[in-house]
């Protein structure tokens, strides 16, 4: 894959998937993987969660952290036992080693970017 420069969401081909054993099928596209960047980015994905679907609860390693940037819609974010409402404009950090998941209980499709970063230093367990 060439270095990442620019991508338009309307040009993406979305693939159905069941994310981390979540409920139902979400749709996503890998915009760019690690090879497309010169920094510590593992990947940038665009995802759409139709009403009633979810990204299942899961945990990344201590060498990865993940960002969710919500573009539209609303959802319930579960992180380490706590649930928070998220909506358009929210940027959420899922910490290294932290458990998290996202569900869409609402009537509209939840659209977001998922960005995974490589941790330069490995965090100590909490």
Provide a role label for each language-model segment.
Residues 63-65, 69-75:
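Glycine- and acidic-residue-biased ligand/ion/polar-headgroup-sensing regions
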């Amino acid at each position: 894959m060439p270095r990442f420069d620019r991508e338009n969401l309307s040009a993406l081909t979305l693939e159905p998937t069941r994310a981390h054993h979540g409920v139902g099928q979400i749709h996503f596209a890998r915009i760019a993987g690690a090879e497309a960047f010169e920094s510590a980015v593992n990947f940038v994905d665009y995802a759409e969660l139709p009403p009633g679907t979810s990204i299942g609860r899961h945990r990344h390693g201590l060498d990865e952290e993940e960002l969710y940037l919500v573009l539209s819609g609303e959802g319930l974010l579960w992180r380490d036992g706590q649930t928070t409402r998220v909506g358009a404009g929210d940027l959420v950090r899922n910490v290294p080693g932290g458990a998290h998941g996202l569900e869409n209980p609402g009537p509209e499709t939840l659209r977001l970017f998922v960005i995974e970063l490589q941790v330069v230093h490995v965090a100590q367990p909490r």
